[in-house]
């Protein structure tokens, strides 16, 4: 069991290390998300850079690279503790990708994918929490933070045996959002639609001249 679990942890890290945001931006001829916008290679930044379809692709593939390793581990009968380590490995790969000089994203979509095999009802609650918070506040990061804080309680309600590994995953996501928390506290965080609205205003001004 330990050999299989360790193998799955390595596999999960390598899956997580495939930075979909960087690859998709290259294919779509969008700016490098690591050096443009917020500097975060994730779906929200890709959306800010002007690619709705590209952002959707990033989101889907980021979810899958967290979901697939955990799903395989779940099918192999790994206990909750080891499944938690597999999930964390996938997120660590996304955050510190070995294939992209260890400069990765925040791990939110990958964490969501890693939680999905526990149950679709839980996944629905997580997505709903993120969407509701993000739409009401305009801050994608706040949606991620609130979802990470609530996730262990959701899991405890539905499948308590997975509470500890999900709590570890939530801690990782919250640590990655330390800078966002600081900016939110000081009122300096960018809203989801702020950059796109600014670009539209510039386009309107240019069209008048």
From Swiss-Prot:
Source organism of this protein record: Sodalis glossinidius (strain morsitans)
Gene name tied to this protein: plsY
UniProt keywords, alphabetically: Cell inner membrane, Cell membrane, Lipid biosynthesis, Lipid metabolism, Membrane, Phospholipid biosynthesis, Phospholipid metabolism, Transferase, Transmembrane, Transmembrane helix
Reactions mediated catalytically: an acyl phosphate + sn-glycerol 3-phosphate = a 1-acyl-sn-glycero-3-phosphate + phosphate
Protein name per the record: Glycerol-3-phosphate acyltransferase
Record bears the keyword Metal-binding: no
Subunit note: Probably interacts with PlsX.
Keyword Phosphoprotein assigned: no
Disulfide bonds, paired cysteine numbers: none
Family: Belongs to the PlsY family.
MF term (GO), any: acyl-phosphate glycerol-3-phosphate acyltransferase activity
Places the protein is found: Cell inner membrane
Domain of life from the UniProt record: Bacteria
